[in-house]
């Protein structure tokens, strides 16, 4: 934040520099990347009357295609999973679906989703940022890691797209039981007092209070060409890496790697060959193949443009 910097882990947790040192000791080469997070605002300090409501999808879309109000997953349905993981015993389980929201969930209790809101920066926002760029660690040289190409900080947006008079901002509730509002599209590392000025130039946020300031993060990652297609490290047998440590950015990217690393770790324990998806079989196959065969110089995201077999990878096929 500004000229202040300190080591740390996830929010409120200590740093894990010892883990990085251990990975280096076994022969893994590490690099540095950067990311950022926006400020969190107090919900009741925002004037929502001045901004646009963006409601969630109704009905709520689920990852499953099963639409029945109630369904059961029997052992026959799970047979392929048992084979995949190498289980040699029956895995009995029962799953229930419901009408609208998960039983006993927050959504079930309050009976509806909480909407997001769309607002915009103003000319005053850009003026405050330009006047304080010299305080940003991203521009003063304190941070050297490469950031995510498609999630620029608000400083980068103002500098790189100087012709734009405004930038879209999403105000997203952190949850139903908190007053925190996540200001999506407003990542910054400017000093706190500057952040207060910046936030109050956003439409609807003229009197907003910051509960948690924005900050930039520089973190270690393992160059993923040191991994096998199974996501096992080449230098240390039985060690599998998945997610941001492999130089990726994004929830789906991390989830896909975690799925494959978990499957292959379980299969290794059971003495089975690894599962490796090809580029013509799945986007996970494209993702992992790119990681282990190409040089990663910036946080990696998966796109349809990266898949030469994109027409046969469509979800509608």
Task: List PLM regions with ranges.
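Short acidic, glycine/serine/threonine-rich loops at helix termini
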Residues: 1-2, 35, 42-49, 220-225, ...
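Glycine-rich phosphate/pyrophosphate-binding beta-alpha loops
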Residues: 244-252, 308-311
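A glycine-rich dinucleotide-binding beta-alpha-beta segment and adjacent secondary-structure elements
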Residues: 155, 170, 176, 182-248, ...
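Non-catalytic terminal regions with compositionally biased, polar/charged low complexity
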Residues: 259, 265, 273-317
């Amino acid at each position: 934040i500004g000229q202040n910097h300190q080591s740390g882990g996830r929010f409120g947790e200590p740093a894990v520099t010892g883990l990085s040192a251990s990975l280096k000791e076994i022969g893994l080469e590490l690099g540095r990347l950067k990311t950022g997070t926006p400020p969190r605002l107090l919900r009741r300090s925002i004037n929502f009357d001045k901004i646009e409501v963006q409601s969630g999808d109704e009905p709520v879309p689920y990852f499953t295609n099963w639409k029945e109000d109630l369904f059961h997953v029997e052992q026959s349905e799970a047979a392929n999973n048992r084979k995949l993981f190498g289980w040699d015993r029956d895995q009995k389980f029962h799953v229930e679906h419901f009408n609208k929201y998960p039983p006993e969930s927050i959504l079930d209790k309050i009976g509806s989703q909480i909407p997001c809101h769309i607002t915009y920066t103003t000319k005053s926002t850009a003026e405050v940022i330009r006047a304080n760029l010299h305080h940003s660690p991203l521009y003063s040289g304190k941070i050297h890691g490469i950031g995510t190409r498609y999630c620029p900080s608000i400083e980068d947006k103002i500098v790189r797209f100087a012709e734009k008079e405004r930038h879209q901002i999403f105000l997203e509730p952190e949850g139903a039981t908190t007053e925190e509002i996540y200001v999506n599209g407003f990542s910054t590392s400017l000093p706190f007092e500057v952040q207060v000025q910046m936030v109050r130039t956003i439409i609807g946020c003229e009197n907003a209070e910051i509960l948690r300031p924005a900050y930039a993060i520089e973190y270690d990652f393992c160059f993923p060409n040191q991994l096998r297609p199974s996501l096992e490290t080449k230098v240390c047998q039985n060690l599998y890496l998945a997610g941001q440590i492999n130089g990726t950015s994004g929830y789906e990217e991390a989830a896909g790697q975690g799925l494959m690393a978990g499957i292959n770790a379980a299969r290794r324990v059971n003495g089975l060959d690894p599962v490796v998806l090809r580029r013509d079989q799945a986007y996970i196959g494209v993702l992992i193949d790119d990681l282990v065969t190409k040089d990663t110089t910036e946080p990696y995201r998966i796109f349809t443009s990266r898949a030469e077999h994109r027409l046969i990878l469509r979800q509608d096929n």
